[in-house]
Amino acid sequence: MSVRIIFFPDAQKALKNIRNSLKKTGTLGISVHGQKNKVPFFSNILDAVMEFIPDYVPRGSPDMDRFGTKNALDNEIRTAGFSKILIKDFTFNYSPGKFDDYWKNYLKYIAKPLKEKLNLLDMSKRKALKQVVKQNTIPYTKKNGIIVFPWQVLILTAKY
């Protein structure tokens, strides 16, 4: 069974239910993004948006990177009763293309409630937001204009 626990508000409840569904010889597999500073694909935009729309992410929503360290992930899984926990850390490069591609795809694929909040910004604030995001991408932008982000992923396996 493979699960991405960042989407569960009550991760312990979900993990315990998963554990109860596994055979005694079963293995759990989980992949999570690293901390936001190790996955700037997300943080470059999200940090900027939060400056313009403080309630962009609803209060009480789980942090996207709450399991983004080996220690946090290990603790969560161990607390749910799993054993023989192994976590591997991978960092790879990901390119969303040039800035306009990155920005347009973000706007295209965000959830409807978030898109509605962005659409409430007046045009001058939307332009300013886009400029802040563009500034955030500069450290990852090559001379040819292509953005290349590092992307950390933690992959965990654990036994029942």
Where are these regions (language model features)?
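Conserved Class I S-adenosyl-L-methionine
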Residues: 62-160
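Generic structural signal for conserved hydrophobic packing positions in ordered secondary structure
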Residues: 1-4, 45, 102
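Non-membrane alpha-helical structural segments and their capping/turn regions in soluble enzymes
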Residues: 8, 12, 39, 123, ...
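A short SAM/SAH-binding and catalytic strip from SAM-dependent methyltransferases
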Residues: 1-12, 34
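Conserved catalytic/acceptor-binding region of the Class I
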Residues: 12-97, 143
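Short conserved AdoMet
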Residues: 9, 23, 160
